[in-house]
Amino acid sequence: IDNQTRVCHATTPPAMNAAFGRGAMTGSWYNLKKAKLIWIEGSNLAECHPLAMKRVMEAKDNGATIVHVDVRYTRTSRVADHFFQLRPGTDIVFLGALINYIIQNKKYDADYLRRNTNAYCLLRDDYKFDAGIFSGYNEKTRTYNKETWGYKVDANGKPVKALSMSEPGTVMDRLATHFSRYTFEKASAITGMPV
């Protein structure tokens, strides 16, 4: 017998630990009702997590905007303020185009990024990402040596931060370079969603 615990939630803690430093939920369902914008992607929350959807609907009643991105129209789509339908397997391209737009048009909170993220940190000069492969890849063993994936560090071993996120070699600079290829036109051609 298969169940949601193994299929869905078993992979969540390792991914969250890698992304956020801990494998537990980063917010509470209760706080969802206080949101101004709720983005639901690749999930039919109304049917898969009805208690979470209850909080989403409370947020909507409080004026929140609900966005649903999925390959199919569902009960979640029906209550969303905006529904974006993608071709299966094209979510990353869609998100890449949004990330590119946000970076190119400076639609981010620079102060938040400075205080709470690694956007200003300088990456090592030997870090590379060429043709979809990170530096340190050993073709023979098909494994990575992740040594080059770190930051430039000072004499105390602490990451060196630039004065500007746009300085060459910062995490934000590399992020902007990587996502620059994800234009709305390219995303539209791949996802099937009009520009």
What are these regions (language model features)?
Residues 1, 59, 88-90:
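A short alpha->loop->secondary-structure connector
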Residues 27-75, 83:
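A conserved hydrophobic secondary-structure block that centers on an alpha-helix together
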Residues 26-29, 46, 50-53, 88-92, ...:
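Short, amphipathic alpha-helical segments
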Residues 1-34:
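Anionic-ligand anchoring segments at beta-strand to alpha-helix junctions in alpha/beta enzyme folds, i.e.
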Residues 23-25, 44, 194:
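Gly/Ser/Thr-rich beta-alpha loop segments that engage phosphate groups in nucleotides
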Residues 19, 40, 190:
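Short glycine/serine/threonine-biased micro-segments
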Residues 16-19, 56, 82-84, 100:
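Short low-complexity, flexible loop/linker segments enriched in glycine and/or proline
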Residues 63, 72-195:
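Long, well-ordered, tryptophan-enriched scaffold segments
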